[in-house]
């Protein structure tokens, strides 16, 4: 179900906007993404050959993003539209051929599902927590954990897929895109070595998260999730689940709770008070905090935040 609807007057506005766009001339490849993380990767690869717009902001819940007239104008203008997939955007973009979907309402044949300008990145990455059976028993993660970009290995895979897609749309710029990818990949490899060195003393440390967003990240950096504050992805906390989680945190001596900026803090703080744990606010997307300005600084911020709190809790002694 699509939660957003667009007023009928928008048709008039869109018609006017289309005429303006057509008269503006070629300004390079216009790319729209569902998330800021995709936008950052597109910018790294596309460089000055693309203009990139994200429909969401990094401090928003990427599962539930308001769609407005500006969103549809951006979609109408796009040569390429990228999505995270795995039903991440289902609640606000819909799927298939639904007439209520903003993708259908934007009246841009270039980016309709199945066209060259519609690109779901999820088939190109490693997805964790894939269920044996696809049901809503997995909450809003019915196809597995859709926050896969938080693993830098997947960041590289995403960038490679974006390189191939941009090259298909702009063959004359293919060499440029490949060069940009090589620079991105080398920089990411250098930073991964630094991140691995920083986090290595804390392999096996246990955390609780608000939302099941960190599966790929925790697996990549060898940390352990004991549970989530949400009973299922996207389902609000309840007393029964919270009480069980508190008991388990005490039993396993979990002292860190990861919370993204888009979530409420009342429940995490209550749990922290009852368990002696610390609430650590970590962005799950580019722009989630001011210092997370691109893909590299997002992961840098998250790693540094975790290392700092682990150091404090361990008294500087590694186990």
List PLM regions with ranges.
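Extracytoplasmic metal-acquisition and chelation regions
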Residues: 24-319
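Bacterial N-terminal signal peptides
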Residues: 9-19
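Bacterial N-terminal signal peptides that target proteins for export
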Residues: 1-10
């Amino acid at each position: 179900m699509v939660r957003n609807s667009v007023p009928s007057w928008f048709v008039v506005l869109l018609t006017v906007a289309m005429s303006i766009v057509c008269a503006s001339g070629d300004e390079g490849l216009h790319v729209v993404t569902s998330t800021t993380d995709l936008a950052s990767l597109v910018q790294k690869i596309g460089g000055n050959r693309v203009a990139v717009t994200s429909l969401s902001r990094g401090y928003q819940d990427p599962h539930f993003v308001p769609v407005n007239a500006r969103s549809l104008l951006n979609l109408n203008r796009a040569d390429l539209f990228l999505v995270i997939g795995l039903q991440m955007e289902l609640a606000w973009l819909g799927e298939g051929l639904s007439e209520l979907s903003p993708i259908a309402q934007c009246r841009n044949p270039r980016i309709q599902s199945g066209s060259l300008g519609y690109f779901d990145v999820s088939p190109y990455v490693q997805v964790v927590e894939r269920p044996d059976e696809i049901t809503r028993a997995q909450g809003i993660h019915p196809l597995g954990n859709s926050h896969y970009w938080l693993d830098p290995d997947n960041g590289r895979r995403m960038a490679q897929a974006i390189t191939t897609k941009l090259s298909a749309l702009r063959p004359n710029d293919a060499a440029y895109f490949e060069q940009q990818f090589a620079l991105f990949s080398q920089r990411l490899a250098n930073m991964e070595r630094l991140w691995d060195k920083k986090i290595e003393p804390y392999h096996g440390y246990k955390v609780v998260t608000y939302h099941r967003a960190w599966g790929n990240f925790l697996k990549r950096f060898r940390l352990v999730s004991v549970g989530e504050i949400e009973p299922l992805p996207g389902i609000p906390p309840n007393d029964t689940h919270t009480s069980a989680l508190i008991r388990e945190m005490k039993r396993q001596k979990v002292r860190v709770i990861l919370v993204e900026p888009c979530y409420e803090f009342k429940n995490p703080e209550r749990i922290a008070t009852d368990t002696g744990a610390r609430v650590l606010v970590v962005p799950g997307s580019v722009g989630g905090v001011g210092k997370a300005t691109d893909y590299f600084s997002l992961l840098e911020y998250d790693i540094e935040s975790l290392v700092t709190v682990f150091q404090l809790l361990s008294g500087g002694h590694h186990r």
